[in-house]
Amino acid sequence: LEYYQMLRNSGYSDDDIILIMADDLAQNANNPEKGVVRRSVDGDNLYKNVVVDYRLEDITYNDLAVIFSGKPDVAHPEVLDSGAGDNVLFFWSSHGMPAGLALGDIDLVSGKQMARILQKMSDEQRFRKMMWIVEACYSGGVAKECEGIPGLLVMTAANANESSKADLWYAPYNVYLTNRFTSSIISRLYSDPATSLRDLYNVAFTGTLGSHVTIYNADNYGNLYQNTMREFLGK
């Protein structure tokens, strides 16, 4: 939700954003602040004015493939209708395991499956550049399968052999509010939306404890010192 709000604040409308989420926090019976989701104790309500396109429990890998295909149908009215000149920011936060990334409670998406989706997009010239940020345990395994795709850069919270750690325990609610990987990236982007990809990686790497933030496919993307996040956050 923090990325969603950041994009909205950068000038993007809901027509430019596809939001897939579990949507089980704001109105949860155990949430002391009904309708409120925060990343920090005194942070803004990230659920404010949110438009959810798909609930996670309704999404399988096949649904994901349709959404990324750019071809809408009755069941998938909102799709990634991007073209050769578009830069795509893709954020995925979920559980992960060596075999792949969790999609809801029962589906598991492997690295080979994600590579098929993204390679097809590349073959059809449906993005200029894509930045895929993955917050999940063992996320490096999926990213490694996607190497070789032109214009794609993947940054993961952990390599292929380790878990990713939660951060900021809030005792009154008995819950972790965020992940150090994400909080490091978000803080940097708020302070410098035009930060270079190299600097963003360094901030995430040094700010993340318990796992190794890793970049994949840089050789097929471009110069990380010269390329910046302004390409994804500037409308």
Where are these regions (language model features)?
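Cysteine endopeptidase catalytic domains of the caspase/legumain-like
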Residues: 1-235
